[in-house]
Amino acid sequence: MPVKLAQALANPLFPALDSALRSGRHIGLDELDNHAFLMDFQEYLEEFYARYNVELIRAPEGFFYLRPRSTTLIPRSVLSELDMMVGKILCYLYLSPERLANEGIFTQQELYDELLTLADEAKLLKLVNNRSTGSDVDRQKLQEKVRSSLNRLRRLGMVWFMGHDSSKFRITESVFRFGADVRAGDDPREAQRRLIRDGEAMPIENHLQLNDETEESQPDSGEEE
């Protein structure tokens, strides 16, 4: 075993970080110690995770995550269609001028309103109830499902709740996993809008995956004080 890999595995940060990565969490610059650790040992950890048929990826935006291959030895499950749609909306909000104006903080209501503005409400309601009639009860269920999706994406490191107030959150750069394939000279925000409205296909690697076995047991480390 290479000396640097042995040092990485012996580091006290590694056990919790390894568990987080295996559960599908994205590690961005906000997690200073973990991110610096991955930067220092990236080359050796890439070889380590390759043994499990997963790739340690550092995205252009700087965050890290594990991308499973078809033969992965780490349990996985694919996010729901609504989870993916919420992720696309979060990416759109990240690109919006409002993010700077609001110091990067959004509310769950703003997320829900943007979702209804950009996506087809009838299709969204069908995701909750295939026989939806557009009733107030169906809309309430949709809002609850959106909250659940946001919480699931929090566990993936896409958003940070503001302290103990889960109604407010800050979006991280990891939402670019849901980003549109921006063409040369194109406006990123407009490309993201097309992705949401026209249902453009996302690259296969963007079909995010999560280890369900650890999902509920993950600590609420995505909160800010």
Curated annotation (Swiss-Prot):
Biological role stated in the UniProt entry: Involved in chromosome condensation, segregation and cell cycle progression. May participate in facilitating chromosome segregation by condensation DNA from both sides of a centrally located replisome during cell division. Probably acts via its interaction with MukB and MukF.
CDD domains: MukE
Gene it is expressed from: mukE
Protein family membership: Belongs to the MukE family.
Taxonomic superkingdom: Bacteria
A Pfam family annotated for this UniProt entry: MukE
Lineage: Bacteria, Pseudomonadati, Pseudomonadota, Gammaproteobacteria, Enterobacterales
Gene Ontology process terms (BP): cell division; chromosome condensation; chromosome segregation; DNA replication
Quaternary data: Interacts, and probably forms a ternary complex, with MukF and MukB. The complex formation is stimulated by calcium or magnesium.
Subcellular location: Cytoplasm, Nucleoid
Protein name: Chromosome partition protein MukE
UniProt keyword terms in alphabetical order: Cell cycle, Cell division, Chromosome partition, Cytoplasm, DNA condensation
Organism, scientific name: Shigella flexneri
HAMAP family in UniProt: MukE
Biased composition (Acidic residues): 212-225
Disordered: region residues: 197-225
GO cellular component, as recorded: cytoplasm; nucleoid
